[in-house]
Amino acid sequence: MNSEKKHKKKSKMERGLTNRHVQVMAIAGTIGTGLFLGAGRSISLTGPSIVLVYMITGGFMYLMMRAIGEMLYQDPEQHTFINFITRYLGKGWGYFSVWSYWLSVVFIGMAEITAIAHYVQFWFPSWPSWLIQVVFLTILGLVNLIAVKIFGEVEFWFAMIKIVAILAMIATGIFMVLTGFETPYGSASLTNISEQFSLFPNGGMNFVMAFQMVFFAYLMIEFIGVTTSETKDPRKVLPKAVKEIPLRIIFFYGGALLAIMSIIPWRELSATDSPFVTVFELVGLKWAAALINFVVLTSAASALNSTLYSTGRHLYQIAHDSPNRFLKSIKADTLSRHNVPQNAIIASAALIGLAAFINVLPGVSDAFALITASSSGVYIAIYILIMVAHLKYRKSKDFMADGYLMPQYRLLNPLTMLFFIFVFGTLFLQESTVMGARGSAIWIVAFGIYSQWKFRK
């Protein structure tokens, strides 16, 4: 018993991630699976101006990362940015945030494992969804349990697949435009974008609705900051990983979307089919659908892998800061001999596995949209709280004047919060997301009040 207590106190999570791991994960971390599958749907909403939606949303996510990065740079020992909410806003908001964030990431994990089963059934339609989910959860769970170095290596190669796929799309677009490649839709040309351009071709409301779709593509971008804490030199790795986010967004999202719309006039794009598949089939790649399915499968597996990493560390933090009988019974506050939060990862994986039951709930026709909306709403509340915590940090004795500072924070911090509130409002505009939005709103109010009451007793 004494040796176990000693182990709890002295053990620290392994700093096994290298700069190579973090930089590639940082690139891939800004690229959501939605780009490969949902680009057609988002383009159909608002045409070429979808690029503007991606740039605006990406810009505000970058500003949030600058706020998180500034605080992590000052205290690189933190393994979760939620600790800054506790430190600067109090235990009540910290309790609300750490549980809400953990649950919202679990919801995202449920969406990811649901998607993985769908992608595998592309090749094996007779395989039951629950079996696919169990197999992937087990494999990726083991990856997270062995050592953080193994997690980093697996994520590195998952990330490379996404990056290569987008580079191939951009290169294909450049080649087809330069050669005037003829397709059934006409010649590949930039005029497919510029001709009869309108900022709101389908009305202002569709432009507004595109923001919540794009926002979900960026969720968990803060994972970039979390991973840097498990590198040997976080103060060197963190600024480089964060400051390159805008260029990555412009190049990968902007480049891919412009390439797609240059090849195929946007009004001809299917809202349901992947434009990546369509483009690669145009250049004669008969197995394009299988190729893109493989890319999105590895992308979803990468996201689930990161989710297990994140939820395990956040539950470990909860077990330390706000222990309860259940967390004590599963020893969620202990590390394995590999210095990873083994029990916390297993508990998180078990909860994510409940996705199979959610998918058959009566009355829920679109489980993925329900989970997406719920997690997005709760996520927005956490993002707003971290921005408030950043304002408090700037006025605290912890402020590091020569640190990695967020630029023009007095203006850009409040603007970022207003943008997040705007995105939350868009969740109520679509039938498939309004149920989840209402649920997240009820959670934010009810659990927020309870959390404040709990620490004022």
What are these regions (language model features)?
Residues 1-40, 44-49, 61-66, 77-78, ...:
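Membrane-interface "cap" regions at the ends of multi-pass membrane proteins
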Residues 1-6, 83-86, 112-133, 165, ...:
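Helix-loop-helix connectors at the membrane interface of multi-pass transporters/channels
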Residues 8-13, 51, 125-128, 160-293, ...:
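Helix-loop-helix junctions that connect adjacent transmembrane segments
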Residues 14, 37-132, 136, 245-250, ...:
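Extracellular loop-to-transmembrane helix junctions
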Residues 77, 100-114, 218, 222-231, ...:
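Membrane-helix boundary/coupling elements in multi-pass transport proteins
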Residues 83-86, 90, 122, 241-305, ...:
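TM-loop-TM module centered on a large, flexible mid-protein loop between adjacent transmembrane helices
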Residues 117, 130-188, 215-219, 242-247, ...:
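Membrane-interface loop-to-helix entry segments
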Residues 158, 330-340, 380-431:
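C-terminal membrane-solvent junction of multi-pass transporters and transport-like membrane proteins
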